[in-house]
């Protein structure tokens, strides 16, 4: 899901980390923060490139609608990044960002699962995917609204659901081997990026409450993993957009 900025660390947590550790440890933590800032910049760049790569496809009537409107996905991510930056520099109430971020999860879930579902060739697998979409949407909505106990639970569930959908896509490929090379198919690269992103993100998201409360020195590592997973996803999206050129030739 275009990236949901789940690990926006509060200043109070950072102060607690800095007060607790020795100078060498603080230097290590600072190094992770610098790396995190670098990766965040790369993340910005890849998301923006992805947006422009796909918005160019919108007017191309020869492409299927799922590719033509895929620019909507990175556009929501860019919006969240802007809101996060405004929040960081106190130009925006952070509650606005938090709620926008949480409810954007519904868009990410619906858009990605829809994109994957329409690429499924096997009728039984597609029917299964459609049923899962109908069942899981209200579950995620309820978690967004009512979950107050377990931090990031709604994100964990959403990413696990997306992982299931990407797995269905790969099963479908094995059952219905494409005539073209996989590496020339835009959808393959897009869904591969979504798959890798989910695989990398699920463990740190699932452990986030434990880490934030008990091992705050590892927050930087978790943010690094998160940024890396999203960078890989957007690079895969860009590759998918470039593959559309072969479809037009």
What is the predicted function of each stretch?
Residues 6-8:
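Cysteine-centered motifs
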Residues 32-249:
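Terminal, non-globular segments
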Residues 17-38:
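Short, strongly hydrophobic alpha-helical membrane anchors
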């Amino acid at each position: 899901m275009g990236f949901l900025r789940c690990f926006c660390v509060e200043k109070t947590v950072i102060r607690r980390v800095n007060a607790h550790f020795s100078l060498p440890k603080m230097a290590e933590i600072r190094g992770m923060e610098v790396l995190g800032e670098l990766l965040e910049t790369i993340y910005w760049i890849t998301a923006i490139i992805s947006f422009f790569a796909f918005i160019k496809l919108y007017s191309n009537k020869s492409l299927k609608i799922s590719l033509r409107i895929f620019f909507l996905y990175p556009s929501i991510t860019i919006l969240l990044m802007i809101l996060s930056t405004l929040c960081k520099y106190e130009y925006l109430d952070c509650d606005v960002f938090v709620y926008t971020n949480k409810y954007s999860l519904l868009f990410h879930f619906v858009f990605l699962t829809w994109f994957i579902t329409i690429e499924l060739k096997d009728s039984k697998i597609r029917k299964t995917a459609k049923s899962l979409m109908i069942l899981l949407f209200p579950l995620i909505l309820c978690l967004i609204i009512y979950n107050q106990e377990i931090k990031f639970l709604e994100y964990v569930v959403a990413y696990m659901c997306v992982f299931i959908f990407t797995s269905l896509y790969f099963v479908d490929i094995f059952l219905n081997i494409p005539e073209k090379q996989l590496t020339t198919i835009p959808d393959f690269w897009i869904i591969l990026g979504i798959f890798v992103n989910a695989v990398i993100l699920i463990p740190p998201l699932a452990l986030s409450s434990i880490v934030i409360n008990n091992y705050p020195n590892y927050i930087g590592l978790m943010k690094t993993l998160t940024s890396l997973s999203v960078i890989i996803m957007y690079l895969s999206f860009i590759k998918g957009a470039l593959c559309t050129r072969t479809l037009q030739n």
